[in-house]
């Protein structure tokens, strides 16, 4: 095949895909990347951070991107990597937990909530984690009293806690401040999965913060050991651009393996060959948007989230919880059936595991008119 024929054939397949701008993708935590990232992607498309000695400039951009994210998270001296996404980030954190526990002689008992992302199920399978599931409060956050009592009743047997800041299904935020105190008092590692919330919570206006939640989650809390945060979600970087940050580089020794045939003799990330596009694009978008840009993006999405919630109630629908961030859960005992019918009508939503509800994520590509059309479709779907 010649080049033009190949491109024409590829276009046929690309045209089968959905486009974010159509406003029909309502269940994804990704969105259309910032236009600047097209140029950055072309500039860095052949770089490989898996062999950083060959791409020293790209590696320096990664370090600066981590420092900028760390600054958002209360610690510009944080150590970490721009990697494939939240799954790899969470696996990396659990791998560090495992190796720290091995050195300290603790059993690999980790407290992880039911609201955690499915990547922790993968971590459990790969690393043979013993997972303790605490009960949830009515706000779908971990019961801190249960955790405190459990740790007290099982001294030196808990090696780590995972808290969620912006849970995938509902957007709820665990009380990381209290979990931090428990971690410090008992010499326990604390990982925060803020894959989605990390580029939302720091930029939220106070008027959108609910009194039932503690919004602190970052390295300003002494007990936080590591944080997952994805620039390719609300950070507007292209896929794949996930992030794993540790409080300091003392965790590196728990991740390193020998890599004698590369330009650096030790390697820490789960994926060896890593495109430099994610790191460069994260650097570029963060430099361009800055705090004011992200505040506008986040709070525009929150305004639309509140609009959707208000209109849902006018239509007679209920939400499982008031929106904590830009995620809305629509109570529906027949969630899977409704989800399938909506998909037949062109709207792609998802469902929650921990509650009977449809799950809507209001990303920057969603406009008010998209919400109105969706509401009419949902209302008609539930009428029959």
Swiss-Prot record:
Report which superkingdom the organism of origin falls in.
Archaea
Name the reaction it catalyses.
L-tyrosine + H(+) = tyramine + CO2; L-aspartate + H(+) = beta-alanine + CO2
Protein name, entry field: Probable L-tyrosine/L-aspartate decarboxylase
Give GO BP annotations, semicolon-separated.
carboxylic acid metabolic process; coenzyme A biosynthetic process; methanofuran biosynthetic process
What is the stated purpose of this protein? Answer: Catalyzes the decarboxylation of L-tyrosine to produce tyramine for methanofuran biosynthesis. Can also catalyze the decarboxylation of L-aspartate to produce beta-alanine for coenzyme A (CoA) biosynthesis.
- Into which EC class is this enzyme placed? lyase
Gene3D superfamilies found in the cross-reference section: Aspartate Aminotransferase, domain 1 (3.90.1150.10), Type I PLP-dependent aspartate aminotransferase-like (Major domain) (3.40.640.10)
Task: Identify the taxonomic lineage of the organism of origin.
Answer: Archaea, Methanobacteriati, Methanobacteriota, Methanomada group, Methanococci
Checking HAMAP family in the record gives: MfnA_decarbox
Asked whether the UniProt record includes Nucleotidyltransferase among its keywords, one would answer: no
Which spans of this chain does the record mark as coiled coil?
none
Print the keywords alphabetically: Decarboxylase, Lyase, Pyridoxal phosphate
Name the encoding gene, please: mfnA
SUPFAM superfamilies named among the record's database cross-references: PLP-dependent transferases
Q: Which organism is it from?
A: Methanococcus vannielii (strain ATCC 35089 / DSM 1224 / JCM 13029 / OCM 148 / SB)
Please list the cofactors this protein needs: pyridoxal 5'-phosphate
Family designation: Belongs to the group II decarboxylase family. MfnA subfamily.
Q: Does the keyword Protein transport apply?
A: no
Pathway-wise, it operates in: Cofactor biosynthesis; methanofuran biosynthesis; Cofactor biosynthesis; coenzyme A biosynthesis
**In-chain residues carrying the UniProt-annotated modification N6-(pyridoxal phosphate)lysine:** 233
């Amino acid at each position: 095949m010649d080049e033009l024929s190949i491109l024409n054939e590829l276009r046929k397949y690309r045209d089968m895909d959905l486009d974010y701008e159509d406003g029909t993708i309502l269940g994804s935590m990704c969105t259309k990347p910032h236009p600047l990232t097209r140029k950055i992607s072309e500039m860095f498309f052949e770089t490989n951070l898996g062999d950083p000695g060959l791409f020293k400039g790209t590696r320096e951009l990664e370090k600066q991107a981590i420092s900028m994210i760390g600054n958002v998270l209360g610690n510009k001296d944080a150590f970490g990597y721009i990697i494939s996404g939240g799954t790899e980030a969470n696996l990396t954190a659990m791998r560090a937990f495992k190796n720290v526990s091995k050195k300290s002689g603790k059993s690999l008992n980790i407290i992880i909530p039911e609201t955690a992302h499915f990547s922790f199920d993968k971590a459990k399978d790969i690393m043979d984690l013993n997972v303790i599931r605490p009960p949830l409060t009515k706000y779908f956050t971990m019961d801190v009293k249960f955790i405190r009592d459990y740790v007290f009743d099982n001294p030196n047997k808990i090696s780590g806690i995972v808290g969620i800041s912006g849970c995938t299904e509902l957007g709820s935020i665990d009380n990381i401040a209290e979990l931090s105190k428990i971690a410090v008092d008992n010499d326990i590692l604390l990982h925060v999965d803020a894959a989605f919330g990390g580029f939302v919570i720091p930029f939220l206006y106070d008027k959108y913060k609910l009194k039932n939640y503690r919004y602190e989650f970052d390295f300003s809390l002494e007990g936080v050991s590591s944080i997952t945060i994805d620039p390719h979600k609300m950070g507007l970087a292209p896929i794949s651009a996930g992030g794993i940050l540790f409080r300091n580089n003392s965790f590196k020794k728990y991740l390193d393996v020998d890599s004698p045939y590369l330009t650096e003799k030790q390697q820490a990330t789960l994926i060896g060959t890593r495109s430099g596009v994610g790191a460069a694009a994260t650097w570029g978008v963060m430099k361009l948007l800055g705090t004011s840009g992200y505040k506008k993006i986040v709070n525009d999405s929150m305004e639309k989230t509140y609009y959707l919630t208000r209109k849902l109630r006018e239509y007679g629908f209920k939400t499982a919880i008031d929106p904590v961030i830009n995620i809305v859960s629509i109570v529906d005992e027949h969630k899977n059936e409704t989800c399938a019918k909506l998909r037949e009508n062109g709207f792609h939503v998802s469902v929650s595991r921990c509650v009977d509800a449809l799950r809507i994520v209001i990303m920057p590509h969603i406009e008010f008119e998209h919400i109105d059309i969706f509401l009419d479709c949902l209302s008609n779907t539930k009428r029959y």
